[in-house]
Amino acid sequence: MTENLTEKIIMKIIIKIACFLSIITIPAIQIQSQESLWKIYDQRNSGENEVALLSNTSEASINNLEHSEKVFPELSLYCEEGSPNISIKINWKRYISSFNKTEIGIKIDGKNYTWLSFNLDKTGQISFQNPSTHSNELINKFKKIKKLAVEIEPYSEPPINVYFNLSGFASHLENLKSICSQ
């Protein structure tokens, strides 16, 4: 009888300790995951045209039909040599179009899509905006939101939608601006 009572007490203590540990570790894991959403690359001495790059990977993969694989697009903000202005680009990691420009729908916190013109690089995989009023407006909007939806329609294919978790963006943007202004 006393053994049974002792086992029950020990089990209750173990359960309380487990609950306590989960209360402590879950916020730490959430903070760590928000930190790992963003990666900043300081490329000042690399010889690259891009001085610094802040990037975030999409929440889910998309199909790359050319290579029969799944890929995760990357949203990046960057500055170039000799200019503190910040530009936006999305590396779709798959072919989008052979045209020089494309339209991309940006949905901020569940509102309607706003369609913006983006340039495409020579590979047809990376869409980008030069530092302009639109880039600055978008960056300011990104600071206020947690989730970004982006839609693009590859040449002769149905639209592709990707989502980016922008948690922690504002603080990482400040780090990027600091590197770009040096």
Predicted regions and their residues:
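Hydrophobic alpha-helical elements and their junctions with loops/disorder across both membrane
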Residues: I9, T25-I29
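Bacterial N-terminal signal peptides
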Residues: A18-I26
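A generic "folded-domain core" signal
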Residues: I31-Q182
